[in-house]
Design a protein with these regions (language model features):
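Surface-exposed extracytoplasmic segments
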Residues: 1-257
């Protein structure tokens, strides 16, 4: 299930804002930025979630950030991804947050912007395309919630280094006859990035300045990411699909880097 596949999870104190934690969850591996005509990315009818456990006295997660995505085709008359200011596979997201382990959710962002793939200068910069810069598209995709969380969802270069050819060639690593090669170089993943104030993650709402030490157990959190689908998919006679049933986890990744 590539669209629901967790690739990597990262969590660290933000180097530019020590009062926040940055969490990055990557999905949908091995994407070519110019990989038309399908342009794989975040899937519809999938719940992408980041789970946070900030209280060792209670089981399970305490905070959940849930992302769901929608796609529209602004110019269905063409197979081009972008043309004359219109974008196909245009993706937006809704962000919800639970602070009671998933019992209730509050909507933080609706209609969040997912930037398009950087498929080439004619499509991004040219007058027959979007007539802008990719830097501006990425900047416009940054969002801030009313509570101060910073959010980004979109395609990014896969930051991981792994010699996939060596790994799956009977564990040929380091390579016996050549240098290691980055198997994910110049390939994208679909990234969910959050920058969250520490007081929103600490169980009692304390800031980092209130920690007794770097090992203060009240400031230790557990983080994992998941993707879930509903159990029933119906292929309708007209060619459309409908979904129902319980939501079941189909991908999970912990032990953040």
């Amino acid at each position: 299930d590539p669209l629901a596949d967790n690739t990597d999870l990262y969590a660290f104190v933000s180097p530019d804002e020590p009062g926040t934690v940055t969490i990055i969850a990557a999905y949908v591996p091995m994407q070519l930025p110019h990989g038309g005509p399908n342009y794989f990315g975040f899937g519809e009818n999938i719940r992408y979630e980041i789970h946070i456990d900030n209280n060792i006295a209670t089981p399970g997660d305490d905070i959940i950030y849930r992302f769901t995505f929608k796609k529209v085709h602004e110019d269905p008359t063409t197979f081009f991804y972008i043309r004359l200011g219109a974008q196909n596979h245009k993706t937006t997201y809704t962000l919800e947050r639970s602070r009671d382990g998933g019992l209730t959710f509050t909507t933080l962002i609706e209609g969040g912007i997912v930037p398009p793939n950087n498929i080439g200068p004619r499509s991004i910069n040219g007058p027959a395309g979007l007539n802008t810069t990719y830097a501006e598209l990425m900047e416009n995709a940054l969002a801030t919630t009313a509570d101060g969380e910073r959010v980004f969802c979109g395609p990014t270069d896969d930051p991981f280094f792994v010699d996939l050819g060596g790994v799956f060639d009977l564990g040929d690593m380091p390579r016996q006859d050549s240098e290691p090669r980055d198997g994910v170089a110049c390939l994208n993943v679909s990234t969910i990035a959050l920058k969250i104030p520490i007081e929103w993650l600490q169980k009692d709402g304390k800031t980092e300045l209130e920690a007794s030490s770097i090992l203060d157990p009240d400031f230790v959190i557990g983080i994992w990411a998941s993707a879930s689908r509903q159990t029933i998919r119906t292929l309708n006679a007209a060619g459309s699909e409908s979904y129902g049933g319980d939501w079941i986890q189909v991908s999970r990744l912990g032990m953040p880097l």
